[in-house]
Design a protein with these regions (language model features):
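Surface-exposed beta-strand/loop patches in extracellular or lumenal glycoproteins
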Residues: 99-113
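Proline-anchored loop/turn motifs at beta-strand termini and strand-loop-strand connectors
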Residues: 113-116, 155
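Solvent-exposed beta-strand/loop surfaces of large extracellular or lumenal domains
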Residues: 116-141, 160-166
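Short strand-edge motifs at loop-to-beta-strand transitions and within beta-strands
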Residues: 96, 136-140, 148
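C-terminal beta-rich recognition modules with glycine/proline-rich loops and embedded aromatic residues
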Residues: 1-99, 133, 153-271
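Hydrophobic, well-ordered secondary-structure elements that form the walls
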Residues: 110, 150-152
Length: 271
């Protein structure tokens, strides 16, 4: 019911509210905007969703699966017809099942996302070997039978990523992704003054199933630090190493600010 118009990589409410250059970045989700281009764009995208999920080779010999979304489709071309059913909990996990009913489809090409380092593929219950093509697809020859079922399990683990060196704002910082999802750190989980946090980029990452705003998600736990900066009225002082090890909690970015106003960061310094 509420959403963001802009999608900042960090939110420190006191900065946005008091800074004219940042006050367009809201610290709470909004119900409506004066310039509301998003709702019609969402409607347009959903109306054409089928063409984003599936595609056909020009000679119609190969069915392409581009997006992993629960769906059913009937393909009809030049007198040929078959049905496709895709079942998945993606992006909660990398398990996908595709059923093709009809003998008029001989091959299927399934997108192999760049974030996945490997995949297990089964055709009609038998594990088969498939390589990722240069174009990023897994090509499977279907058996000559009425119903074919392809089961895939893409490897999906949390990964620490870095930005290109030309993005100076993210220098010596890191972020966490899991599958296609970008993660963030919120103060409700990690405490206030979130700018004091650091991440052990080589540390072990743990995942645990959780729920936020009615959405089942994977929460990621990481090893990190909290630096204690100068307090009180002193503006400057002699530098002292004041930090402690802490356990960091990260949630999917698209769910931030569903538990009240607070601080948020995607990119945090590395230790």
């Amino acid at each position: 019911e509420h959403f963001f118009y802009a999608n900042p990589m960090e939110m420190l409410p006191r900065r946005s509210k008091d800074n004219p250059e940042r006050n367009h970045l809201k610290s709470v989700r909004q119900q409506w905007y004066a310039c509301s281009c998003c709702p019609p764009n969402i409607a347009r995208t959903l109306a054409g969703l089928g063409k984003y999920i599936y595609g056909l080779e020009e000679d119609e010999s190969i069915l392409y699966v581009n997006q992993f979304i629960n769906s059913e489709a009937t393909v009809e071309r030049n007198g040929k017809q078959y049905q496709v059913k895709l079942e998945t909990q993606f992006p909660l996990n990398g398990i996908i099942s595709i059923t093709i009913s009809g003998k008029d489809c001989s091959k299927i090409a399934i997108r192999h996302p760049a974030w996945s380092s490997g995949v297990k593929v089964k055709k009609n219950g038998r594990e088969i070997f498939c390589e990722r093509s240069e174009s990023g697809y897994i090509l499977v020859d279907l058996d000559t039978q009425e119903i074919n079922r392809i089961d895939l399990e893409f490897q999906m683990e949390p990964i620490v990523i870095a930005a290109n060196r030309k993005i100076s704002y993210d220098a010596r910082k890191a972020a966490i992704i899991m599958g296609p999802l970008l993660y963030c750190f919120e103060s409700i989980d990690n405490g206030s003054e979130i700018e004091e946090l650091g991440l052990y980029a080589q540390g072990e990452l743990e995942t645990k199933r959780n729920s936020i705003a009615g959405k089942e998600i994977n929460t990621i736990y990481a090893k990190g630090t909290r630096r204690r900066e100068l307090e009180g009225d002193t503006l400057y002082g002699v530098y002292q190493e004041m930090k402690e090890d802490v356990k960091l909690t990260a949630i999917p970015y698209f769910l931030w600010n569903n538990r009240g106003e607070g601080e948020m960061k995607v990119w945090i310094p590395v230790e």
